[in-house]
Amino acid sequence: MHILIATDAQWVVNEVKAALDSPSTTFAVLSNGREVAPAVAANTPDIAILDMQVGSMGGMAITMDLRLDQSSGALPKVPVLMLLDRVADVHMARRSGADGWTIKPLDSLRLRKAVTAIAGGGCYAEGIPTPDLEEETAEEAVAEDATVTEEVAAEAVAAADTVAQ
């Protein structure tokens, strides 16, 4: 398995590697969010693990950038696990198009469980803060948000076309 990690915090790299390292696992570690899309284009990972805060381009912006490039066919679909700082960030993770998220502090069991689910084509969600959403499965939440993300991406492309004219 090839895992891309985007974070500027060495402790996050250490935690993720400790939880997921195996003889068949390789890691690409990036400390600048702007490097993620080119890295995906060069060597598509099985999963991208994105810290919510990564220098000048955080996990939400990185995920939205990836999803926009994927919707245009410029990049292949890459499953994204976002590492959130707090429960309040769940809304942003859902809206960005992430396939799953976990809330820090990290632990090996939850990381392995999340990566297994997401890399296998599923979803993983923690900390959905509103009672009416607790019954919604992670897959339903991500599917709903993917539609919203596609609509936002289409609006962004239309706006860019208008500006270009």
Residue spans of the language-model regions?
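Conserved phosphotransfer microenvironments
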Residues: 46, 50-68
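His-Asp phosphorelay/catalytic-motif detector in bacterial-type signaling
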Residues: 71-79
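C-terminal output helix
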Residues: 106-115
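CheY-like receiver
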Residues: 122-165
